Amino acid sequence: PNLDEKVNLIKLPGLDLFQTFSFKDRLKIFIKKKNKRAIDFYEFFSTFFGGFPEMRTFGERAKEFLDINNQFDIVIDNQSISYGLLKIQKKFPLLEVIHHPITKDYKFELQLNRSFMYRLSRHRWYSFLKMQKKVAPQLKKIVTPSFNSRKDIASDFSVNKENINVINNGLDIDIFIPYNEIKRNPTKLITTASADVALKGLDYSLKSLESLTDDFPEISLTVIGKLKKGGHTSRLIDELGIKDKVFFKTDLTKEEIAKEYASSSIAIVSSLYEGFGYPVIEAMSCEIPLIATNASSIPELVGDYARLIPPKNTNELSNSIRSILNNYSHYKKIAVKGRQHIIDNFNWLKITEEYEDIISKTINDFHKC
């Protein structure tokens, strides 16, 4: 991570087996590891059989580190929800940050492909959910970035809602700015999505684009994300015949992303689920008219400053794009108000003050016990 020079980074390295997907290379990494322990064997064999063990192994290594380093005032964990946290929680004030329950990712991935082997592979990959469902209900202090995630964590992980505090994520509002000097392309659409990730609903944006090509011959879609060669999204683009109208851009800085918004006319968030939709507030901060699904956390983020549509509805998306392109000045005025909404509610000063309060409360409550 990129850290301030005043922040000390303590590394707790595992085998790092996901640096490669070659079995031979992974085996070499495992064999070269000196003084192997049970946790290393678990990490290797779980990965070998298609699992993702890193959350569990990190939690165990963090517990071991904290057993001999007790100088910390509080421990903040980001979504590992691992067994090790239950032991850490007995010795330290613990604040667990959960973006959303990964049960949602699992659910939507199963909907993407119904073949037996695919479903079996997903079952193995998400096998860590069994651990998380056991650990989450026992955590005393949880922070999540939206009320929708709070509801889903309570439901899917059987957590008492009183233990879950909502603090929105913040945004660099001085980076995601309108860039009014950049001329907008009147028929350029933009979205942020990881190709082949079912949750992001990119399929519906692509199908909508195809349906609009007759009415708007110059229309195009820029996707902030990476296209997987030969993957589902790549095949769909070929099937729809829109290869010359879809452009993927990766490895952009925040400033470059903001400038992409500035040169576009409509931002689209066609997600099926968002624990906290960063693309939503990034687009709004850049004063671009926004179309987003009314799914999960999105309505509570956008307020009255975006055009909301049902998820998986290509016709509604196409009609919304037409409406905005045909009445752009009206929707641009809404977008200007939308930026002020983001400034008021998602600036880092507000968010950090809320985190300071919950951190102080977590420490005080621990020492009262």
Question: Can you describe what each PLM-predicted range is?
Answer:
Residues F23-F49, Q89-K133:
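Acceptor-binding helix/loop patch of EC 2.4 sugar-transfer enzymes
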Residues N148, G170:
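Carbohydrate-associated surface elements
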Residues I182-K200, L206-L209:
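Conserved donor-binding/catalytic core segment of Leloir-type glycosyltransferases
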Residues H232-E255:
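Nucleotide-activated donor-binding/catalytic signature segment of Leloir-type glycosyltransferases, i.e.
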Residues K259-S264:
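Short alpha-helical donor nucleotide-sugar binding micro-motif in glycosyltransferases
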Residues P289-A292:
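Short hydrophobic beta-strand element within catalytic cores of glycosyltransferases
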Residues R307-T314, S323-Y328:
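Conserved acidic donor-binding segment of nucleotide-sugar-dependent glycosyltransferases
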